[in-house]
Amino acid sequence: ACRWSDHYEAIFVEGRAEYRRRDEEIDSHMEIAVSPEDDVEVRRITLTNLSSRRRNIELTSYAEVVLAPQNSDLAHPAFSNLFVQTEILGDSQAILCTRRARAPGENPPWMFHLMTTQGTPGAEVSYETNRATFIGRARSVANPVAFDLPGPLSNTEGSVLDPIISIRQSVIMDADTSANWHLVTGMAESREAALVLIGRYCDPNFAARAFEMAWSHSQLELHQMHATEADAQLYARLASSMIYANPLHRAAAVILTRNRRGQAGLWAFGISGDLPILLLRIADVHRINLVKHVLQAHAYWRGKGLEVDLIILNEDFSGYRQELQDRILNLIGSGPEVYRIDEPGGIFLRRSEDLTEEDRILLQSVSRVILTDSAESLTQQVTRQAPAIRKVPRFAVTRTPSAVMAPEPVPSRDLLFYNGIGGFTQDGREYVVQIRPGKATPAPWSNVLANDRMGSVVSESGAAYTWVDNAHEFRLTPWNNDPISDPSGEAFYLRDEETGQFWSPTPLPAPGNGTYTCRHGFGYSVFEYTQNGINTEVWTYVAVDSPVKFVVVKVRNQSGRARRLSVTGYWEWVLGQWRHSNLMHIVTEVDPASGTLYARNDYNREFAGKTVFVNVNEAARTVTGNRTEFLGRNGTTARPAAMWQDHLSGRTGASLDPCAALQAPFDLAKGQEREFVFLLGAGNDAEEAHQLVRRFSGSAGAKLALECVWEFWKRTLGTVHAETPDPALNILVNGWLEYQTLACRYWGRSGYYQSGGAYGFRDQLQDTTALLNAAPWTAREHLLRAAARQFIEGDVQHWWHPHTGRGVRTHFSDDFLWLPYCACRYVKATGDTGVLDVQVPFLEGRAVNADEESYYDLPQHSDEEGTLYEHCVRAITRGLRFGSNGLPLIGCGDWNDGMNLVGAKGKGESVWLAFFLYDVLRRFSGLARSRNDVAFADRCTQEAE
């Protein structure tokens, strides 16, 4: 919410939800129902003016448009949003949305949103479908720019980059009067069907009918299930724990910490692990009624669209265990879910005697809710209260905040190509951005800090996300892909321990009242800021040779008096692809000797054993591994609850909302400076993690690591130097282009816009060719890496994930040709012909069918090997396939991925590919001749001519 209310109440009954608020003498009552007749949600809002004066009230709706499966949206939200189109229907006070089709036969759905009112209208209705215009850069839904000034929305429509649906309507309300609105959001299979629904629900009476029908339908469902309203309330309450795992209903922490098996361990039971799991443990045949109620709850959820895997574990080891098994089967067979046995979202009946101890631990660990046939009834188990936890004392103010000191003027800098916000330093080695209060860059201006094992994308706001080994598969902190709000799962804070005032040493998430300076350099970023006489300088960088990220906070007291402060670091754990699918399985602990906070996720089968850590070089610190504690209920990183607490609780372990937070209080004399070194890193196992902490902790380790970063990039980027009449080109060529290629493209394979993590066969071969002068070793290692992703037939994986080898096999016609092309370029640039004789295995896998564009799989390594030269020959041979015009067949695309339909029928040809193949043949003929492979050299020459 944008603000706290004077009064707030939420009411849930069958068929609808209700919310009541009171704000500044305005009562609001919102009711929500889903029509059982149409695919629409209706919100009925009633506002009552309790004041003694006339009020002009604006009502603004807001929702973000997806129109795609969840995984598609999560994988790349900014890309997914590009295909959404919006249309304003002013006559109907509605907005239409759809998604442009991307494949033949695709029939995207249509979405609509409308608003009607019964009251005295004020200004004209206005609309917004562009999220950037509504929210504003570096803002959020809590403080959108659309509310800065009264007036209409912009009425933007069309192919907006980030789609929303928002309608604003105002009414004039006299004292002690009410006004009513209906907000309707719905889906249809076609534009015509959507228009029919819009016309229908523009009628307030029909919108009101949805509430009546929703209640009637819910009562009918309960009657058919032989359930009561009280049963439904109980099942709905239990459903909240199925959606948001509640530690109160999960396994004990001691069980969770013992689990060492991943999702694949469930497959032997026919359970995918993709759906929420409820585990019912029963051993007493006399408690069979508990099974009946749980089966009823499961059917109730399925009727509401909540898919849950229900595991019933027969733990009766007596001679009556078969009787219990039969009774359970009879209950299932007599109910509505008889056809859902061993089906996704269905019922899985298993005997405990058939399970190993590891199996039982796994099933308990993955279950969001565990119910037992203990003395408690289902109602008692669901409504069980959490034991009281000793709360951390509130922060006690010991000094009244004085007037906020005027921000010190930021010294002007003589920057090249200054655009009013930022520019390059005179030597071109840093890009400097100045963020004034209330201002922001047009889009996030980020720096990719990386080595070959770890990376982090850091924006000018201080927002960051970090990964190890693979930017897609093993993220340490969340990748958000939101260039508007620029949210972050990493944050730092300074707090005055006398007044309680706090701020971030970076522009986000909790900005102060002054100007921030961000300096992006080669391998590092720096943030400078002064607040109330406290100057901070934050350096962030990644070690050259280890998976360790540094955030060094230098604090200098320029206030003219002694100060007592604290510095806090915060990280939201992911330890996998997505936070929501991993948070249940993350376990944290603190090493009592070093104070390091460790985290692991053994459920992630590809990275099981990885041990992640954070540390700070200050013995007097408090910690927490509980995000709910740090942020608070409905809290944000802009105003975390921890800033109103005396210290952090020290709580870590399993079954928490996982995070890492370290807080270190300190004293600072007048004119004194102190340095705090925060480490974020990961080891392949606990021992490597311990070694990394010991090696890099403290100022000396941080300083040495930074000097190594400087030296590496100075040496690497100093290889190529150009002097041209164009100073802009000089800056790019003399450092930045090669830096971006190596750090972002080759090592990171990630950026702010896209977080792929995979190697693209053509992509990184091209990247390393660009580095032949600066870093030729990258070209050599990647030629061999890429060759190992070639199938025995000569084609290759279009892209693949390192660590696992899973990837995509396609009909692309150019991928494999980049191998001989880049091999020729490498040998010519370096003279290293020995690489051509290195033996590299091939892959084996099924061929791509003629009627499919690609498939994703884990191919096997073949027993057949060949030298890199032989891999190149096989690639060229594969490319010598021509169409009726004598041009190479394009397959499902050449270098232009957008040409994927040209060769859909196996006949399309590519002019571009003909030029490229010609170049490859001419280059490789010379290479073949130098190796005395005259026959293939002649063939290359003949094919080229």
What are these regions (language model features)?
Residues 62, 570, 581, 585, ...:
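Catalytic cores of carbohydrate-active enzymes
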Residues 301, 493-495, 768-886, 910-918:
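Aromatic-rich carbohydrate-recognition surfaces in CAZymes
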Residues 1-765, 776-789, 825-830, 930:
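Anionic coordination/interaction segments
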Residues 32-36, 155, 285-289, 540-544, ...:
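Alpha-helix capping and helix-loop boundary segments enriched in small/acidic/polar residues
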Residues 390-395, 845-853, 902-904:
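Eukaryote-specific, cytoplasm-facing alpha-helical/coiled-coil scaffolding segments in long proteins
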Residues 273, 719-722, 726-729, 734, ...:
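Aromatic-lined, polymer-binding surfaces characteristic
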Residues 279-282, 880, 888-891:
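Nucleotide-activated donor-dependent transferases that construct or modify glycoconjugates
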